[in-house]
């Protein structure tokens, strides 16, 4: 059982609506108020079912002890499922809460119990003294105790690497590195014309990652039927609808293709590894991430948070010559897992399960690594630009390094800033704790001024030795390579987040939002005026080879059909009536050329429309329409019909 104990001036509640597991109640308990009370928010858990009487007795002891400390004889028992992710059955929860209520009354306490299984509005006024907010965990004998903080779900103690702990304590210094090559104090830097850089600097220095309100992309990802929360899973694990899956697939194929052009070989490796593997155990403590853990056959396993493990173990077993270097391998992880803090999770911005293109490059020495770093920096800029995220306006650059590396490679770091064409934030460490000496990230700044890392490259000086990775040089001697870690785009989900946030901000400025044509789930929508025009529309769609076309053949007004196409950000909308059936050209509303409330209509042939779309999407991945072509036959994934 989890208890959150609040000494309150008052607590009051009002029942609103029953859930499927609601207990039957009398009218008298549909609302309640208690003053000068100890409010006990309680969640009965699965392990409690093994010995409920023990849990009642120990819960009684815990509540009485706190009540005596705060000098009250009034207790409000309030069922609060949000304290745990491992709840008991509803029947057991009611049994334990009723047992606890009776036990408290038997000890002379004035007790009220809010009903179980009902949605309730409640108001509480906490007294605010040192003992006014306490938490307690009750476990049956033989069950391992797990402590929780107030209002946080009870979980097994999370596995936190030494790198995470160090990151929380590590001292570093922030500067602005300008295009003139000078390091400047971020507190006195003139941010005129660099509003997003200022927002990023504030975000970095405050280190506040928790979410206080929902960003616009959350509503958009649902309205566009791309993705949604999955209540049946752990927070930060999403469901993807057909349109979103198609977008993800094309982004994945694009990034893999760009890596292949640079000589990267695609591999696939396991998603879980042994925590006691001597090499992996050391690496866990050098990587700043929190892990999911799995117990199987008495083994403690962790779910990977990157593809490093599998690729490095593969590198260890390979025979590598200096002639093979630089050697690149890439894996598109579906998925990588990081147990991000619950308060930081929101939409597609920060997830616990995500799709990450993860490329590693083995280089002969530091000079070779620096050259590759510069090449991959350029690759990342170009990758995001094609996706639709521009270095000039959409993201800010962070470069992080040790002081020694900066002093030895200042001109190279300055060249990165010049390529960005704008000042960047740099973070300098006095000494190296992590496995890398240099890294950059491209950080997208959203409408709430939160930053999220996209592309990144790191120079790794530890893991070749840790994993015993070698290559044979010209003299036949074994040497350790320098390793680059690169994600050309960052997490695929974050790319979609960035596109949606960008268009939300553009819309606020009066622009017409749209996705890049190559990523739009539907590229052309054909709107029929009446049922008799449907066969012609179908024939028209058949002529549009390698274009994603759907047909709005619903029994709706033409106006509604066109408005709905606008809400879905369809790049090209064609309306078909009698005139179009008898003519050579069709009227096409071109979204990219339109203004709000002022659509741009262009007359063109079907062949001209197809040619235009093929030019806009040339050399980019193509997927067929991911949903049923007929809107009349298409199910809705979000909302009601």
Curated annotation (Swiss-Prot):
Listed under catalytic activity are: tRNA(Thr) + L-threonine + ATP = L-threonyl-tRNA(Thr) + AMP + diphosphate + H(+)
- Full protein name: Threonine--tRNA ligase
Region entry Editing domain: which residue ranges?
1-154
Which Gene Ontology biological process is one annotated for this entry?
threonyl-tRNA aminoacylation
Query: What is any one of the record's Gene Ontology cellular component terms?
Result: cytoplasm
Primary gene name: thrS
Q: Which GO terms describe its molecular function?
A: ATP binding; threonine-tRNA ligase activity; tRNA binding; zinc ion binding
**Has UniProt tagged this entry with the keyword Zinc?**
yes
Q: What are the leading ranks of the lineage?
A: Archaea, Methanobacteriati, Methanobacteriota, Stenosarchaea group, Methanomicrobia
Q: For this UniProt entry, which residues form the secretion signal?
A: none
Write out the similarity annotation: Belongs to the class-II aminoacyl-tRNA synthetase family.
Q: According to its UniProt record, where is this protein located?
A: Cytoplasm
């Amino acid at each position: 059982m989890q208890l959150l104990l609040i000494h309150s001036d008052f607590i009051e509640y009002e029942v609103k609506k029953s859930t499927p597991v609601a207990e039957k109640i009398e009218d008298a308990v549909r609302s309640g108020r208690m003053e000068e009370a100890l409010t006990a928010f309680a969640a009965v858990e699965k392990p409690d079912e093994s010995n409920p009487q023990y849990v009642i007795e120990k819960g009684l002891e815990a509540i009485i002890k706190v009540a005596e400390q705060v000098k009250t004889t009034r207790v409000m028992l309030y069922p609060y499922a949000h304290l745990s992710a491992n709840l008991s059955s509803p029947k057991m929860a009611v049994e334990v809460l009723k047992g606890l209520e009776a036990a408290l009354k038997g000890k002379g306490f004035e007790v009220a119990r809010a009903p179980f299984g009902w949605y309730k509005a409640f108001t509480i006024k906490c007294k605010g003294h040192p003992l006014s907010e306490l938490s307690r965990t009750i476990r049956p004998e033989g069950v391992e105790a797990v402590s929780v903080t107030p209002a946080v779900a009870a979980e097994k103690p999370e596995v936190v690497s030494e790198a995470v702990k160090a990151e929380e304590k590590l001292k570093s210094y922030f500067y602005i590195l300008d295009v003139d090559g000078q390091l400047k104090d971020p507190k006195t830097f003139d941010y005129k014309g660099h509003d997003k850089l200022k927002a990023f600097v504030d975000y970095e220095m405050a280190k506040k990652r928790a979410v206080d309100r929902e960003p616009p992309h959350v509503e958009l990802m649902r309205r566009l039927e791309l993705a949604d929360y999955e209540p049946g899973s752990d927070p930060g694990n999403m469901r993807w609808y057909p349109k979103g899956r198609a977008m993800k697939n094309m982004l994945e194929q694009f990034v893999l293709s760009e890596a292949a052009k640079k000589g990267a070989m695609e591999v696939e490796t396991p998603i879980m590894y042994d925590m006691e593997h001597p090499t992996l155990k050391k690496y866990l403590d050098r990587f700043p991430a929190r892990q999911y853990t799995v117990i199987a056959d008495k083994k403690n396993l962790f779910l990977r948070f990157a593809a490093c493990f599998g690729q490095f173990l593969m590198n260890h077993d390979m025979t590598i010559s200096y002639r093979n270097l630089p050697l690149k391998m890439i894996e598109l992880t579906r998925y990588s897992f990081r147990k991000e803090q619950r308060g930081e999770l929101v939409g597609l911005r920060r997830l616990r399960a995500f799709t990450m293109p993860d490329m590693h490059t083995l280089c002969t020495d530091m000079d070779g690594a620096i050259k590759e770093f510069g090449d991959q920096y350029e690759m990342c800029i170009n990758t995001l630009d094609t996706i639709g995220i521009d270095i000039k306006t959409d993201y800010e650059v962070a470069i992080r390094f040790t002081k020694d590396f900066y002093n030895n490679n200042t001109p190279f770091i300055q060249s990165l800033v010049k390529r960005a064409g704008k000042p960047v934030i740099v973070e300098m460490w006095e000494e190296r704790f992590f496995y890398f000496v240099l890294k950059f990230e491209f950080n997208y700044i959203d409408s709430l001024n939160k930053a999220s890392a996209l592309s990144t490259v790191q120079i790794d000086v530890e893991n070749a030795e840790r994993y015993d990775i070698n290559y044979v040089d010209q003299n036949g001697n074994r040497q350790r390579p320098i390793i680059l870690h690169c994600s050309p785009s960052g997490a695929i989900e974050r790319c979609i987040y960035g596109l949606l946030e960008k268009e939300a901000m553009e819309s606020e400025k009066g622009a017409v939002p749209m996705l890049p044509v190559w990523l739009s789930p539907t590229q052309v929508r054909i709107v029929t005026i009446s049922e008799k025009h449907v066969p012609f529309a179908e024939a028209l769609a058949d002529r549009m080879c390698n274009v994603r076309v759907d047909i709005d053949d619903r029994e709706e007004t033409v106006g509604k059909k066109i408005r709905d196409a606008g809400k879905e950000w369809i790049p090209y909308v064609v309306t078909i009536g009698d005139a179009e059936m008898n003519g050579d050209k069709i009227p096409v509303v071109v979204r990219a050329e339109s203004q709000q409330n002022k659509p741009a209509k262009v007359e063109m042939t079907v062949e001209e429309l197809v040619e235009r779309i093929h030019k806009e999407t040339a050399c980019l991945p193509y997927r067929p329409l991911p949903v049923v072509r007929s809107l009349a036959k298409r199910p809705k994934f979000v909302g009601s019909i």
